Structure formats: C-alpha cells, structure tokens
Amino acid sequence: MPQPKRGRPRAFDRDRALLDAARLFWRRGYSGTSTRDLTARLGLSTSSLYGAFGSKAELFEEAVRTYAERYREIYEQAVAAPDFPTVVERVLIDSVHEFTRPDDEHPGCLLSSAAMADSTSTLDTSAYFAELQGHNERILRARAERAIEEGELAPDADASALTGLIQSIWHGLSARANLGADRADLLAVARLGHTLICGPPAP
C-alpha cells in the first residue's frame, strides 16, 4: 500500500530566524531568553538550533550583527540621496519605520536595548555598537561636508555638530521606541527634527 506523501518541510530562512531571535532577545533580554523560547519562536528542534547556530551565545552574536546591518543599510541608502534634506528625512523617518515594524513584538532598537547589557556572549557589544555608530557618523558627516561644499548648506555650517544633532535625535527616537512610544508619536518627533535641521518645506 503506497504511503501518503508528506508535505515538504518548511524551508529554513536563516536571516528571518536571526531577526526573530533578535526580537526575542530584545523583548526578554539575553538572560531571560531560554533555549526553549528560541526553539519555539524559530520553529526548530534543540538539535537543529545548535546545529545551525552553535550555541545561544553564538546565536545572539549573529543576531546582533544581522540586525545591525539593517541600520547600516539605512544610513548608506540615506547618504546616497540627491539632497541633504532627503538624507536627514531618510535617516530619521526610515529608522522610525524600522523601530516600529508591524511584525516586531517590541518596538525599538536591539543595539540600544537592555539585551545588550546582560549578554554573556563573547561579543564585545559596547565596542561593536561604537564601531557601528562610528561608521554611520562618518558617512553622515562626509555627506554634510559635501552639502556645505556644494552650497546646499550655509558655508559656516558645522558638519560635525550637525551630524551630532541628527544622531542625538536618532538615539532619542530609539530610546522612546524602547519605552513603547507608538509610530505616530515618533514620526511627529522625527518630522519636527527634520524641520528644525532643514527648515520648513517650500510652499
């Protein structure tokens, strides 16, 4: 008697699994996230979880790096914009949309959450976060300097101070998102920040 055909197993999407793990660490913290929590969220057996990622600490490290790349991409795409007001808009507005993605269980940014503080992984999270922020600041400052050179910004504009202001608003949005602020409130703040930096839109 022929055996009934079984459905094909669900394909393993590593990037999706890493983002799901990141959101779980984000919501519960590193210490508060158990292996059972991870297997349930990712739909993997314990042996498959360890086979794919090695250990909880290694999964955390890879999840942090994968999540961080999303913000690196936001900045790199932003600075490629044709004008500086659009650069600022993309950095702030696109980040708010990322902080508050509908499929997240908790809003905000993993890299600035408590999950980083209680991690016992070998990843130096503080140094890694500093490196990422340093990269983002450098490319944003270079874009501001170009805007000054091309006459888009006033010749006496301070590119470093301007970059610091944008980054400060970004960090504030991230912190408020971690505290549960909703998307509409964060977008209002981001848009006000954009207006203060770039001026009101032309009528």
Region roles according to the model:
Residues 13-22, 38-39, 63-67, 71, ...:
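Generic hydrophobic, amphipathic alpha-helix propensity
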Residues 90, 123-150, 161, 188:
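Amphipathic alpha-helical packing segments from all-alpha helical-bundle domains
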Residues 94, 107-116, 157-176, 188-196:
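Hydrophobic alpha-helical segments that form the core
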Residues 98-102, 116, 146, 166-183, ...:
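Amphipathic C-terminal alpha-helical segment
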Residues 1-12, 201-203:
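N-terminal intrinsically disordered/low-complexity leader segments
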Residues 88, 102-126:
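Amphipathic alpha-helical segments used for helix-helix packing
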Residues 16, 24-58, 62:
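Helix-turn-helix
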Residues 76-107, 159-166:
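Hydrophobic alpha-helical connector segments
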